[in-house]
From Swiss-Prot:
It holds the Pfam family NDK. The lineage of its organism: Bacteria, Bacillati, Bacillota, Bacilli, Bacillales. GO terms for cellular component: cytoplasm. Its EC number is 2.7.4.6. It comes from Staphylococcus carnosus (strain TM300). GO terms for biological process: CTP biosynthetic process; GTP biosynthetic process; UTP biosynthetic process. CDD domains: NDPk_I. This is Nucleoside diphosphate kinase. It comes from the Bacteria. Homotetramer. Its cofactor is Mg(2+).
Amino acid sequence: MERTFLMIKPDGVQRKLVGEIITRLEKKGLKLVGGKFMTVSKEKAETHYGEHADKPFYEGLVSFITSAPVFAMVVEGENVVEVTRNMIGKTNPTEAAPGTIRGDLGLTVGRNVIHGSDSVESAKREISLWFEPNELSVYTANDEEWLYEN
């Protein structure tokens, strides 16, 4: 089963949206296999957003993500990267479709509530950056037989 990394950003935590976002993911049939509140170190933020280091918004992004706690999580499901990207919506909440997390809850590009891995490769890299293997659970949910075709 595929896994992806999601992070509810400081704006989402401060606005008390963690429960709503997890509920949306679980209603979609996705399984939470790891999660933790944490204050992000500057080093971890710089590593996570390293691909943007040469962009003008990089310093502000690092500063924002380290400014208050985030909720980092790993979610599992069939085609979970694609499914969660569709659920999250476009980066700019004003362009995100109604019904998506950013379309419904995001305010601006800089306060768009959530990060999600954009590929299976990114998900693997980000999961290993944010979680130790022993922090992730392996279990069969009671409803899995109803969610996936064999």
